[in-house]
Amino acid sequence: MRHRTDVVVIGAGIAGIATAYELIGRGRTVLLLDRDAEENLGGLAKESFGGIWFAGTPLQRRYGIRDSAALGLADWLAFGELGPKDRWPRAWAEAYVERCVREVYDWLRDLDVEFMPMPMWVERGLHVPGNSVPRWHIVWGTGHVLSERLAGHLLGHPARDLLTTRFGHRVDELLTHDGRVTGCRGVVEQTGEEFEVEAESLVVASGGINGDIDRVRANWHTDWGRPPEVILNGSHRFADGRLHDAAGSVGAAITHLDWQWNYAAGVRHWRPRKPGHGLSLVPPKSALWLDWRGERIGPMPLVTGYDTHDLVAQICRQERGYSWQLLNRRIALKELAVSGAEFNPAFRDRKRLRVARDLLLGNRWLYEELTANCEDIVVAGTLPELVERMNELVGDGSVDYAAVHEAASRYDERIGRGPRFHNDEQLRRIEFARRWTGDRLRTCRFQKILDPKAGPLVAIREFVISRKSMGGLQTDLESRVLDLRGRPVP
């Protein structure tokens, strides 16, 4: 099977959709290829919570947040730890913070994408500065609605006749002629039929490598030490680096594959759609983070919302490479969340009253769903029973009751002294987080763990989970893929 088009776009996530939308609007014929099924148009973004980083938006100004491209860039460069040789990562950082409001925020608003009224304040920074102000803008309806809106505008475009879509098509090879990329070749996976595309231009929008756990391990960042025995898969199942290999074979420079944004609080999905399928929890700030023995990780306690990269590093330094979080039902109802569209149905379906109810009264549906189905979560009425069930889960009696009791009772004792005497870094960070309204709504006010009125007790076994690739094909600011000498691949 042969195709001829002006531009072939490989990958129908939001990058591929946006590219195709802009191209047909300029009168170009486009063939949009994707390996997945048509109902999954939108890729991993369709499964995501839908957060996008912006600096200097009208939404921020409405809430009195004084932000700017200059401040955003300063935070980005500090947190990103860019080195002197990172020319293109720095150039892209500068370009994004300068243009993101006009070219992304405003562009999305023009396409009827709405954002929640209050930005979230994540990655505030721990050892180095992070986001100085709240910048995480959440799409109202999660990434599911973001993908649906963009796909709807693409498929309903006045120039729709210029677009051809093909799903179930796996691209294996980029074609060249006289030193120039001229198209691609692959297989229709359902039938085994080969196809070939000839195009004036080719766009790779196929995602990163984090859907292939072997590649994740092979490109593990040195800050994290050795990869843990279990790494759950939280990326797209087809984000496997296949197109990285194809591009590399025609001379593309592939860089910074160790720059991955993975998460520390993954649990196993009980309805897996891929090998090792994991869910990325939003770890409760009021929960105690324990190691595999049940000892509180420290001396610096682990608290989410400040430095995800450091959380992963701390977990990987533990002997067994996984952790526990200790909490109770009251904390779980207010703070426990799963990142993504699947387990935020009220938010995904834009049900305002249910979202408000969950914020005010706690998300009972999610609590029941997780505790009833997730094998990595155990619940008990007393601490001895809880530790017994933790040990039943791991199967070797490695969780020490005395260690868990010591961690919980000492933490509760510090809470009992009152806020003026909170000499515990976790409590200080909870207090700071609650100053921002968006976090105050989702964070308990110094909740004890062993409070009998807040039970039952809950323990969550958490694994590192793969998510986002920050490296890949090196490009200039015109998105032209560069070769090893820094020249555009023709």
PLM features per residue range, with description:
Residues 2-5, 191-201, 488:
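Core beta-strand elements of the Rossmann-like FAD/NAD(P) dinucleotide-binding domain
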Residues 7-32:
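N-terminal Rossmann-like FAD-binding beta1-loop-alpha1 element of flavoenzymes
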Residues 25-46:
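Glycine-rich FAD pyrophosphate-binding loop
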Residues 41, 93-195, 213-216, 267-268, ...:
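Conserved redox-cofactor binding core of oxidoreductases
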Residues 46-75:
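N-terminal glycine-rich dinucleotide-binding loop that anchors FAD/FMN and/or NAD(P) in oxidoreductases
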Residues 66-129, 382-413:
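Rossmann-like flavin
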Residues 193, 197-271, 479:
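Glycine-rich loop(s) and the adjacent beta-strand/alpha-helix scaffold that form part
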Residues 244-246, 253-399:
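An anion/pyrophosphate-binding glycine-rich loop and adjacent beta-alpha core
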